[in-house]
Amino acid sequence: MRILLTLLLLVFALFAQAQSSSLQGVLKDAEGAPVVYANIALFQASDSVMVKASASDDAGKFELQGLKPGNYYLKAIYLGLSDLYATDLTLSESQDLNLGVLSFSPSSIELAEATITASRALVEVRADRMVFNVEGTINSVGSDALSLLRKAPSVTVDNNDNISVLGRSGVLLYVDGKRLPLTGTDLSNYLLSLPAEQIDRIEIISNPGAKYEAEGNAGIIDIRLKRDKSYGANGSLNSTYSQGVYHRANLNGTGNYRNKLFNTFMTGGIGEIEGFHNMDFDTYLNNIYQHETNNSKNASKNYNFRVGTDFFIGKNHTLGFLVNVGENTSQNTSTNRITLSPEETPAAIDSILIANNKADNNNKNQTYNLNYRFDNGKNRTLNIDLDYGRYRNTSERYQPNQYYNATETTLLSQNINAFDTPTDIGIYSVSADYEDNLWGGKIGGGFKITNVVSDNTFLFYNVNVEDGIYVQNDSLSNIFKYDEKVFAAYVNYSRAFGKKWNAQVGLRTEKTDAVGDLQTFRSELQEPPVVQDYLSWFPNAGVTWEVAPQHALALNVGRRINRPDYNVLNPFNNRLSELSYEKGNPFLLPEIVNNVELGYTLAYRYNLKVGYSVTTDQITRLIAPDEDDPRASFITWANLAEQKILSMNISAPVQITEWWNAYFNISGSYIDNQADYGDGAVVDVQTYNYVIYQQHTFNLPWKLTGEVSGYYSGPGVWGGVFIYESNWGLDLGLQRKFLEDRLNIRLSASDLFYENGWDGYSDFNGMYSEGGGRWDSRRYSISAGYRFGNENVKSRKRSTGIEAEAGRVGQ
């Protein structure tokens, strides 16, 4: 029924739009080059009331739809160029008026203070990426980065917070163009501690070019944080309170000062988060039936601070530095209960294991960037980055394992364990990128050298039941050191062929030297280091063709690599209880993906993309039985022989009426996972998945803005073998601005019907497991934001050079 309503609403929206008129054109400068992302506004000729606002795309093209018949004039604004006007425009019923090429003139003065702000589309589809514009969406209030990723088009977040794009795992996560060296629980904690109010947009780059690192077989997700874009002294403050079963609160601020010599900017925030995650599992293993319930609560406090300065050294040179620091401190308590009984008679309970965990965690991160940029203002640029990042995590966990009889009245036995697992990761990087014109096109090249040093200590303690003394278990404790060096270089060339064809081709090479050294506390358990030394080549190419006016095709092909996250290489046993644990695999190979994408764009707005990828040695998460204890199972990582994915994505922004705008996104994929590990451990999984997402924005009376958004996800597969069932969610929001739009008050409700959970099953290697989970997803939030200061001129945006490595740390 939900799917039928969605399709009916889509048909109605398209029908309603078809009755209106449209206006389109192309913006170019005096030399005939496209003017991209210029602000465009259409006014009524009678009273100069603005009717519609937009922006030009990558080719300088723009289109205004949903217009009524009448007389208008158009104004286009771009920094450094004189304002452009097109007057005496008359539209009749159902007319599509093409203004052709509109040319700007150079400007010798700054823009006037009166500017027109163009509202961005929720999702922009470009040749190489999809941009999810978060800033300004009401339903992002009180949310966090992880929740926003669940809503992002083509993105899936599974029950263990693993992220995939169009069914492909191995996503590289960036923040402001810099790789985030975190994985696993550490990454989840970071994303949960990053308020949505600090996020400007999320860029999903499914097929990056040679300039980008080859890491990440599903591409790159780049979370772009807000940064004030104005000259002078200005800033903002935002405070949010959110209530579900537990509360969340945060306070965030930005500041910016710019003059002719330098630009200084800063952002910062503090937050407090409480939440829960409840899971329920039934497992059948070695003729034993286990029913497990795990209810966990997490309470954390965090802060983050970001400051930078750009010095303008002459007309063409900029020297800048950027510092990021953050800390997240959390306490996690969980109640874990497992009943054990014969598989034939599940009701005849043999014993019950109670394993209530308590953990204290602290995650600290610091990154430093020094940047030099040369730009001659025409065609030649040089960018150099020096980066250093430090990520330190500590975790102390106390875990009693107590076995009771079937009525939980008699303690049969107990075994108390404790864990101390500090991690220290250092990342060093230097990179340079150069671009210039050549042979009627543009050539680019560069290099990057990265060194990652990871020191992971895992100390396992047996706790004496009588006196509480901790005794280190040398057989289960270890130190894992990982040293990885990557030397990369690339070249890329692009040019236009006539007015309808554009092509680009690139080649990147990466030399990887990595050593994983597991140091044990008992000499008889010591194994030699695992050494990996390989050279890889990553070609890519793309071509775009304007088939006809308002019809364009884009074809992209490429090859990528995904190296294992640092934490999944460590083979220590990270226990949830004596019967359930995780352990890494130091022999994991990098996975290689070859992919091809074909995109079609209609009227510069409606987009269809079809992709096909083949991944060899795909790194996947599997649940397997323990070799020694027939009751126990563990989670580990292994390489699949092959994964094939056929994917599709459709996006359509629609203006239904003057006061009602909508966005629709439909994505689907077919996934085929294959592997044979011997002894009957076979992976042979084929599944379909689809996700329907839509957002509706309403301009209401009394200057109110309303928002309704929701998604429906069909069944699919997580990792190699876990088949999940469908789920859906609905969000509501309301916004009102005051004080000349400087004060913004927002109310929102997330997952109103509490359906954003998960259920599923896996059947692998003689072990069948099914279960589900829920978290604190239904929330009600209120937010207040205030902007102050001068808001006229833009400041420079830039990123650092270690985002890719940071994505593998696991924070």
Residue ranges and their predicted role:
Residues 357, 478-484, 532, 561-609, ...:
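Outer-membrane beta-barrel signature, preferentially recognizing the C-terminal barrel domain
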Residues 39-43, 77-79, 96-138, 158-160, ...:
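Short, acidic, small-residue-rich periplasmic hinge/interaction motif at the N-terminus
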Residues 125, 162-207:
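Periplasmic plug
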Residues 246-274, 278, 288-334, 363-366, ...:
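Transmembrane beta-barrel wall of Gram-negative outer-membrane proteins
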Residues 45-61:
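Short, acidic Ser/Thr/Gly-rich low-complexity loop/linker segments typical of extracellular
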Residues 304-328, 357-518, 546-550, 606-610, ...:
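Face-selective signature of the C-terminal outer-membrane beta-barrel domain
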Residues 101-103, 145-147, 187-191, 204, ...:
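N-terminal periplasmic accessory domains that precede
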Residues 293, 418, 427-431, 471-478, ...:
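Outer membrane beta-barrel strand-and-loop segments of large Gram-negative receptors
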